[in-house]
């Protein structure tokens, strides 16, 4: 369990609060908008209405006590940048900030952010891949070069074992697991047989995955 400071409780921030709550973490939420704070109250440990660009207000929260500070302010990049910078100045251990464009990410990283997330960009990429390939069922981006795809078993692989196909050597791809009837099995061995009734979870470089599965 970690102690999380969440600044900004718009739609993206609220979704993060819900997920963190489900994972059992302690979350303090901060926003200037009382209505948004009230909306997120069921999912957080504590909440404060306040201006995150005010150094004294942030200092009163005890920034150094949080394991991670997440800045999800939208619609006002200046406030997001100032908040990110102040958090680091006040001793934040890890600052994760939201960006909408690459230029914003560069400024955030130069001014205190340890990591940057692009919710809109990442969702757009997911949708573009997921809904233009009938054999792709899910997609998780690891970084700019690597991803995990849930994909149907290629026709030429059906009835063969993982070891027989030698997927890692041929394609540089790792089979992490298989899914059948909504259940995931990650106990993959060279003897694991592939059928048309399952989907596979494959990890690798984008180029290798695209070539292998014709994405």
Report each predicted region and the residues it spans.
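Cytosolic regulatory regions of ion transport systems
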Residues: 1-215
